Amino acid sequence: MNMNRLMRTLEQDEGYRQFPYKCTAGYLSCAIGRNLQTVGIRYSEARFMLKNDIEDCVTDLRKLLENFDDLPAMIQEVLVNMRFQLGPGGIRGFKQMLG
């Protein structure tokens, strides 16, 4: 079996959707035909997504705070946690803290 060819075919057949949708069978699905109601998301997949989300938070904070990389690790982690929980708009509400 050629995994790459099969993946290309399934992606062509299913398409890619960034946000959840109802498939033709009525199930909540996302990505490339992932049935969220019967398959869900594996823990390893959730960890992979979390890592990507954290990297996005760090990128955003580096734009917001020019000295982000110079801050102590614990402060960086608190800021990333805040950015993750509050979203990009929410953390920008802390104007005095962000200076």
Predicted features and spans:
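Acidic, aromatic-lined catalytic clefts of primarily extracellular/periplasmic carbohydrate-active enzymes
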Residues: 1-78, 84-85, 89-96
